[in-house]
Every structure is written in C-alpha cells, then in structure tokens.
C-alpha cells in the first residue's frame, strides 16, 4: 500500500522551466487595439458587460474610442430602495496615453487613488463620489491606457454595490479578452 502511494506521488510531480513574469506596463502587445470594432467596446460585447455587472438592461448610446453605457438593475428589497438602480458606465482607450498622466488627472480631481495590478498590468482605481458612488479602473495596455468608469446614480450607493469592484471586473475582462 505504501509503495503504491509513493509511485503515485512520483508520477504526479512535474517541473516547469522558466521564471515568473512580473507585472509591467509593457506586458501587452503594443500593437493590440482596444478600440470599438465588430460592435465591441474594450473587446467586450454588450451582453458580457450586462452579465459582469448583473444588470437587467443595457443600452449603449455612444460607441467609438469612448463607449457609453446606461444599465439598470432590479430594485433591492429595502423599503426605500430605488425603483430601478441605474449605472452609468464608460469605456475609454487612449492609444498614446500614459498611466502617469491619467493618474495625475485623477489626483487633480481629488479622487482617492489605489494602486493595483490587474491581469499582470499596472493599474489604479480612482474613487470619486460627487454625484453618486463612482470609480474608474485604469491600466497601462498596449501602447496606451484603457479605463472603465462605473457610477451609481444618486447620492449614495447603499445596496447598489461597489463601483470600484465593478470597474475592476470590466477591466479584467478586457485584459483577458482575445481579439
């Protein structure tokens, strides 16, 4: 019995050569395009965005280097919950942009900045709750930067979720997507 276990363990071991790759701004293909193509923004179709954000409805009133979405979710169970919580979402790709410039702009607007790494890309979250709970997730990608911005309409986000987590999910999905 003991011999069988040793043979099984030995048969399952496997060594992989190479070294771990650190996160960096240039891990992505510099020629990769994240722009609007084939009815996709940030490489994602509308139904994927709807699924990621658990939305009941999605409308994309504008598409281009910047894509705008309006989404709605079912009302919460709380007695004072919005009848249909609304989210505003924007994807942007700045082909020749820089993460430093986007970070500086967010700081000038008094956003709360959190440095993160998403899918091995340097990134940051910028939280700024002015007209509703809002957050953007921005990463260095290709030759520039991509960003997903999510805002819950209204003064608070009680019961609506976390806009930073939603923005991170969208950014992660874009960085994972294949052309």
Predicted regions and their residues:
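Post-signal peptide N-terminal segment of mature Sec-exported envelope proteins
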Residues: 22-45
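A short, solvent-exposed beta-edge/loop patch
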Residues: 107-179
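Soluble non-cytosolic domains of exported or imported proteins
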Residues: 35-43, 61, 158-165
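Short, solvent-exposed recognition patches
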Residues: 54-122
């Amino acid at each position: 019995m003991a011999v069988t276990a040793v043979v099984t363990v030995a048969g399952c071991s496997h060594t992989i050569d190479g070294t771990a790759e650190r996160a960096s701004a240039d891990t992505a293909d510099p020629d990769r395009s994240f722009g609007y193509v084939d009815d996709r923004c940030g490489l994602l179709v509308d139904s994927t965005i709807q699924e990621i954000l658990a939305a009941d409805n999605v409308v994309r009133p504008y598409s281009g280097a910047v894509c705008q979405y309006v989404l709605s979710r079912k009302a919460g169970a709380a007695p004072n919950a919005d009848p249909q919580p609304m989210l505003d979402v924007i994807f942007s790709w700045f082909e020749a942009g820089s993460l430093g410039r986007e970070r500086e702009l967010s700081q000038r607007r008094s956003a709360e900045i959190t440095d993160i790494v998403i899918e091995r890309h340097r990134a940051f979250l910028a939280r700024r709750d002015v007209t509703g709970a809002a957050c953007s997730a921005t990463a260095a990608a290709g030759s520039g930067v991509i960003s997903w911005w999510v805002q819950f309409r209204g003064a608070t986000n009680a019961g609506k979720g976390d806009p930073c987590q939603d923005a991170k999910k969208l950014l992660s999905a874009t960085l994972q997507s294949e052309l």
